[in-house]
């Protein structure tokens, strides 16, 4: 895992490289694009705020936070990963059915899942059990 904010670092990485940034209680996951916007490396993601697919400059994605470079998932070539990502342009965002983690995994052709969603569901279930136990 690499932490970076420097543009020269991210231009060396292939399109489809997975990046993440903390947004409060969750981490927003995206991929480096093959494009530039305003001279910056672009990032593609699936965002609740955008209602789905968004391609934006790296600095907008980062929101002043440190970006963690996760690496490259799967074995599909970058051009195929980007094609698969762009196929989801018209799909609506859904926290439970197709969020940023689902999007990245779909694009890479690996099992589609959301580890953060699974963790939150587990914690919610645990809190429910504790609340019931406290009433007894």
Regions found by a protein language model. Give the residues of each.
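Activation targets extended, charge/polar-rich intrinsically disordered C-terminal tails
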Residues: 87-136
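Glycine-rich catalytic cores of cysteine/serine-nucleophile enzymes that process amide/ester linkages
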Residues: 3-69
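Catalytic toxin/effector domains delivered as secreted proteins or via bacterial secretion systems
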Residues: 55-60, 72-100
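Generic signal for short, ordered secondary-structure residues
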Residues: 9, 64, 82-83, 127
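A general secondary-structure boundary signal
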Residues: 27, 45-47, 78, 106, ...
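N-terminal start-of-chain detector that recognizes signal peptides
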Residues: 1-5, 76-77
């Amino acid at each position: 895992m690499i932490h970076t904010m420097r543009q020269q670092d991210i231009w060396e990485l292939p399109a489809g490289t997975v990046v993440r940034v903390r947004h409060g209680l969750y981490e927003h996951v995206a991929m480096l694009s093959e494009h530039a916007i305003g001279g910056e490396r672009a990032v593609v993601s699936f965002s609740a705020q955008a209602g789905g697919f968004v391609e934006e400059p790296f600095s907008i994605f980062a929101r002043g936070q440190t970006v963690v470079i996760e690496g490259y998932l799967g074995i599909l070539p970058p051009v195929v990963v980007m094609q698969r990502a762009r196929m989801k342009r018209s799909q609506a965002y859904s926290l439970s059915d197709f969020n940023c983690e689902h999007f990245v995994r779909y694009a890479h052709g690996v099992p589609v899942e959301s580890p953060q969603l699974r963790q939150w569901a587990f914690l919610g279930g645990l809190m429910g059990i504790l609340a019931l136990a406290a009433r007894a």
